[in-house]
């Protein structure tokens, strides 16, 4: 059951009402710009004291300081950030999905100005603070976070930073930020072949689906046995379509070879009581004879001569060809073992940084970038983001300052 606190419902409704009632063209002076900035960042009206202080900041030429004041409001975390993050946590992009460890971890990282790249590689997890009377974190359910949300505690003060490995028991070297949270695993390691984790990470954190990175020039040597080389009896379909996604995706998704989301298929088909499973050193899957989870070898008869995953070694074939323009880091090798290093590869790309800025721009400005002025501003905010510790609050502040004058 989806649990949405009464406070969150009220704030969501207020956000919609304020957005409709306060058109950009209505604002001119510092107080009007401050009011607009506060509503865009929080969805609620500022107090007279906060409005006055923000207006003074704007009048003195420091709109960023005004935005920082606005973000001290609980609604920035409970509504604005939650609205941004929640769709990333499920395949349907449902904005009203229950709070979980994926959502809470991102919100906590933003609050604490944690380098946002750690979202895909860090040994990091945010839980409800001790002393709140919540059920303990459980690897096999979401009760802790649903109780936190139902109680209506402000996330700005209720979240506590911990290491993922100490809470879940996952080895530190196997942690990979939100990808290895229970919420992430339930959504994207559920059934299938773990390619979903790669695809949705690409969509949510590089702002690109597979069609946008389609490249038929990459070698097909790592495409697995479960991909037909002649769909419908026509090999041209594989050569012109399938290869364009799988040649790059499959060698990257191999990083997830040791992960699975275990659940009772018959009695718990949606995995509400499922848990992340990881084959550590010395653990052997009887179906594969190695640490590789059995799901990675399914449908092997589709094309028996295809690639058989032996381990979790990944390689980024997109460092060459048209996808080199995603801006891969020159200091990283472009290959490695496991989800952590693969997450670092994605998070250190230029595409990752620009994606975060673009998402915030759309949320705060209530529109997509429209012209060269917008695009230039996104470029400058992205440069600031990457040069100053990947602080997402800074992105919000600079974006709100840009839109406040519209």
Kindly give the residue locations of the regions a language model identified.
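Extended surface/linker regions that mediate inter-domain or inter-protein docking
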Residues: 65-252, 347, 351, 361-364, ...
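N-terminal signal peptide c-region/cleavage motif recognized by signal peptidases
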Residues: 21-23
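Bacterial N-terminal signal peptides that target proteins for export
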Residues: 2-14
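Short cysteine/histidine-rich zinc-coordinating motifs and their immediately flanking basic loops
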Residues: 254-260
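N-terminal mature-domain "stem" immediately C-terminal to a signal peptide or N-terminal signal-anchor/transmembrane
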Residues: 27-65, 70
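Electron-transfer interface patches adjacent to heme c in soluble/periplasmic c-type cytochromes
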Residues: 68, 168, 180-194, 228-229, ...
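Short, thiol/selenol-centered motifs that function as redox-active sites or metal-ligating centers
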Residues: 30-31, 35-40, 44-48, 239-249, ...
């Amino acid at each position: 059951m989806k649990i949405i606190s009464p406070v969150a419902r009220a704030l969501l409704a207020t956000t919609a009402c304020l957005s409709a009632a306060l058109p950009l063209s209505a604002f001119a002076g510092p107080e009007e710009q401050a009011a607009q900035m506060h509503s865009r960042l929080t969805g609620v009206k500022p107090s007279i004291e906060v409005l006055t202080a923000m207006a003074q900041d704007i009048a003195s030429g420091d709109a960023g300081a005004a935005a920082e004041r606005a973000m001290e409001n609980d609604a920035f975390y409970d509504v604005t950030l939650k609205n941004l993050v929640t769709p990333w946590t499920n395949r349907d992009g449902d904005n009203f999905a229950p709070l979980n460890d994926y959502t809470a971890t991102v919100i906590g990282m933003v609050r604490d100005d944690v380098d946002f790249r750690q979202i895909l590689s860090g040994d990091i997890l945010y839980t409800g603070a001790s002393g709140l009377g919540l059920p303990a974190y459980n690897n096999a359910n979401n009760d802790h976070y649903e109780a936190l949300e139902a109680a209506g505690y402000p996330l700005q003060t209720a979240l506590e930073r911990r290491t993922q490995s100490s809470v879940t028991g996952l080895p530190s070297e196997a942690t990979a930020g939100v990808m290895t949270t229970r919420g992430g695993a339930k959504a994207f390691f559920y059934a299938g072949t773990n390619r979903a984790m790669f695809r949705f990470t690409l969509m949510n954190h590089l702002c690109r689906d597979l069609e946008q990175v389609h490249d038929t020039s990459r070698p097909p040597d790592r495409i697995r046995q479960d991909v037909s080389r002649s769909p419908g009896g026509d090999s041209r379909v594989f050569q012109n379509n399938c290869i364009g996604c799988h040649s790059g995706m499959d060698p990257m998704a191999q990083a997830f070879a040791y992960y699975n989301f275990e659940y009772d298929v018959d009695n718990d088909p949606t995995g509400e009581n499922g848990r992340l499973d990881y084959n550590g050193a010395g653990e052997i899957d009887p179906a594969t004879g190695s640490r590789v989870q059995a799901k990675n070898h399914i449908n092997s008869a589709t094309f028996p001569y295809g690639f058989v995953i032996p381990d979790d070694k990944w390689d980024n074939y997109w460092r060459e060809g048209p996808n080199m323009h995603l801006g891969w880091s020159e200091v990283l090798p472009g290959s490695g073992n496991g989800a952590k290093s693969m997450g670092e590869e994605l998070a250190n790309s230029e595409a990752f940084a620009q994606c975060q800025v673009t998402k915030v721009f759309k949320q705060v400005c209530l529109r997509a970038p429209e012209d060269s002025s917008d695009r230039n501003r996104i470029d400058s905010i992205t440069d600031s983001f990457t040069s100053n510790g990947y602080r997402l609050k800074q992105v919000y502040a600079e974006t709100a300052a840009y839109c406040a004058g519209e």
